[in-house]
Amino acid sequence: MRYFILMFTFVCSFVAAQPTIVPQLQQQVTDLTSSLNSQEKKELTHKLESIFNNTQVQIAVLIVPTTKDETIEQYATRVFDNWRLGDAKRNDGILIVVAWSDRTVRIQVGYGLEEKVTDALAGDIIRSNMIPAFKQQKLAKGLELAINALNNQLTSQHQYPTNPSESESASSSDHYYFAIFWVFAVMFFPFWFFHQGSNFCRACKSGVCISAIYLLDLFLFSDKIFSIAVFSFFFTFTIFMVFTCLCVLQKRASGRSYHSDNSGSAGGSDSGGFSGGGGSSGGGGASGRW
């Protein structure tokens, strides 16, 4: 009998020491307490899907009875790390965890949203929207108010691009095409259009035309107008390059050998695209108790 009691005590203590499980992420709202009815889950899910479609921010809700020996912060971090909410590059996931029997709640925010959904804002949402409703045993109402508050914050001040590198790619493409045009223009303008005059005059004429085309493109198609200083530098540099090319070609054509041990070569390096973590959280957010 004594051994049976010892074994029973050991088993009970072992079971009690097991941490709360992290369920598999299969839907936006996971309720392990069965506190929400099907209609409430459907409405909350619809709101979360709408937020994702409008902002690309992934928000998930998890309701558990208790976090046992873990704090709500520890458990929420473990769930976030397991679920990896948010885009891998933007790290813009949000997790709402409610431990209903413990009467604790946590809003865990991904790295990429910590400046948008600050700790202070998350705490205010919990205190002003969730806890008053939870005290009245209105779980669905508190979650709805919190989701609405998060949605207002996300949509009023920030809009996520579907492809974060889209604008960078377009800008890089524009620079690439103009670089090709500039190289060909510097090489062929003096021979196609300006045959007469000294090398300096031909360089000036070519520089004026090339710079004028570039300036016209800025005024017609660009959202930004470069300053006069930038344009002047481009104009001067173009004239210098054309003049140098003409002098080199003239010396070669006249039979004099021209060798340059330190000939310049223009090169560019494409910087690698920025890559984020992978839907992770650094512990940003806030917790509350009622």
Swiss-Prot record:
The chain crosses the membrane at residues 175-195, 206-226, 228-248. Residues 265-290 have a biased composition (Gly residues). It is a multi-pass membrane protein. Gene3D superfamilies: 3.10.310.50. Residues 1-16 form the signal peptide. It comes from Escherichia coli (strain K12). It holds the Pfam family TPM_phosphatase. Keywords: Cell membrane, Membrane, Signal, Transmembrane, Transmembrane helix. PANTHER family: UPF0603 PROTEIN YGCG (PTHR30373:SF2). The gene is ygcG. Residues 264-290 are annotated as: Disordered. Belongs to the UPF0603 family. GO terms for cellular component: plasma membrane. It is found in: Cell membrane. Its main location: membrane. This is UPF0603 protein YgcG.
